[in-house]
């Protein structure tokens, strides 16, 4: 499986450009980003994400009533038929923890839908070096 791609295209679900940057020294947390495309004629509802070797959870950046920017854990999200969702900085993203000892260039993960479908994909792990 290529980094940033998935093998669920036969189900009409495609994940593109899945990537995360390794945390700076002294931290073990990082955010991951991707594009999830739903080419099905029905909505899909994602309830969680699981990754090998590290913890991962779904989050969204929100602005509260006082104008404060906060990170909120998502219990689930949906992608409409023939639609897509972008996980981007300042929006929906995946938070990873336990990366301090992680030394690999890819990270195997899977979205889990409320209907029990597993959508496997690979994150490309990038360094912060230029």
Task: Set out the residue ranges of the language-model regions.
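Bacterial signal peptide processing site
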Residues: 6-8
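C-terminal motif of bacterial Sec signal peptides marking the signal peptidase cleavage site
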Residues: 2-4
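Compact, glycine-rich, soluble single-domain proteins
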Residues: 10-130
């Amino acid at each position: 499986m290529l980094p940033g791609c998935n093998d669920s295209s036969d189900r009409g679900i495609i994940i593109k450009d899945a990537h995360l940057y390794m945390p700076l020294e002294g931290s073990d947390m990082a955010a991951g980003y991707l594009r999830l495309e739903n080419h099905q004629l029905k909505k899909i509802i994602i309830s969680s994400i699981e990754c090998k070797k590290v913890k991962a959870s779904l989050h969204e950046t929100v602005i509260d009533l006082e104008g404060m920017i906060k990170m909120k854990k998502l219990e689930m999200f949906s992608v409409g038929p023939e639609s897509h969702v972008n996980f981007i900085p300042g929006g929906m993203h995946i938070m990873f923890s336990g990366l301090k000892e992680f030394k690999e260039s890819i990270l195997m993960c899977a979205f889990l839908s409320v209907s029990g479908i597993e959508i496997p994909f690979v994150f490309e792990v990038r360094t912060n070096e230029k």
